[in-house]
Swiss-Prot record:
Name assigned to this protein: Large ribosomal subunit protein uL4
SUPFAM superfamilies membership: Ribosomal protein L4
Top-level taxonomy: Bacteria, Pseudomonadati, Chlamydiota, Chlamydiia, Chlamydiales
Family in the record: Belongs to the universal ribosomal protein uL4 family.
Pfam families (alphabetical): Ribosomal_L4
Role noted for this protein: One of the primary rRNA binding proteins, this protein initially binds near the 5'-end of the 23S rRNA. It is important during the early stages of 50S assembly. It makes multiple contacts with different domains of the 23S rRNA in the assembled 50S subunit and ribosome.
Assembly information from the UniProt record: Part of the 50S ribosomal subunit.
Transmembrane segments: none
Organism: Chlamydia trachomatis serovar D (strain ATCC VR-885 / DSM 19411 / UW-3/Cx)
Gene Ontology CC entries for this record: ribonucleoprotein complex; ribosome
Region of interest called Disordered, as start-end residue ranges on this chain: 50-72
Family annotation (Gene3D superfamilies): 3.40.1370.10
UniProt keyword Ribonucleoprotein, yes or no: yes
Amino acid sequence: MVLLSKFDFSGKESGKFELPDAFFTEGKEQSVKDYLVAIQANKRQWSACTRGRSEVSHSTKKPFRQKGTGNARQGCLAAPQFRGGGIVFGPKPKFDQHIRINKKERRAAIRLLLAQKIQTGKLIVAENSVFVSSLDAPKTKEALRFLKECNVECRGVLFVDGLAHVGSNENLRLSVRNLSAVRGFTYGENISGYDIAAARNIVVSEKALELLVESLVSTTKD
């Protein structure tokens, strides 16, 4: 069992969060790399498509007579040297190049990325009240104070809350979005491995971490 410090909005330690040892089972670094590559590759549309000389709309009329003009002979306006002509060796969507990652691989990669953040001290746990009722109105100054009191490096911070449709975290979300140190605000049910890998520091609510542990640890039982 691993114990993580839990902080309130004043930046003081208010308790401990228990993580099962199964959360830190060894994983393959290659699986993390494959997962991150798949996320980035699947953001592409793979829809670039150009028309060759046989596909463009054009007249079959010869541009000018074969001899006597002094110009090089031409037989078709669809040739690539003409404006509106076909493209030579242009891109074509040859096949579906999306990379598929199954659920087990995805969850294993996310679990390993979170474990690395915890082991390097880049993840802190905040009380649920920090995300729900800590602010009566959006206050960027108070959000920045919270990060400093918790000794969070103000750089590339990702806030992770529980479920998107539960609780009222709008004030905190509006407070942190104006900070250059904050990378983003997301929810445990929507988080991706790329969000975790790209963030330098993570502030996660109790509820979000409970949901992540519940969904990720079960995959280690084969």
